[in-house]
Amino acid sequence: YASANKRHFRTRSLKRLKMESMIMAGLEIFDNDIVMATVTLEMMKALDAAEQDMEDIAAFIGQVEGADTAVTVRELRPGECKISLRTGRDLNASAVCALLGGGGHAAAAGCTIYGTVERARAEILRAVRTVRNG
């Protein structure tokens, strides 16, 4: 049981740990409680990372002290970004992502934004602020 617990819940691949390090180095905070991580194709290529190395990155960055909203912008291919959003009880993640054609649940949602990484970052931040400010 102990080895299975460790293998499934307490270990991460070296690629995953390196990716977490790269992501942490680039974290940005907006409005004092929105933490945003960006994962580019260049980052993925540099580590030869795969889809499974990216699992639950949004929850990982939500661990930042004071962060009520965690946004991950991941470039899937040139011109296409996947957004993962995790929120506290004061912001409906599904309502935010619905503004951008996505959906999900109150505390976890996602969408796809077509355009540059910079555009995706600006659009999701604008949507968070729109829903938050009512």
Q: How does the language model describe each region?
A:
Residues 1-99, 104-134:
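Hydrophobic helix-and-loop "lid/oligomerization" segment in the mid-to-C-terminal part
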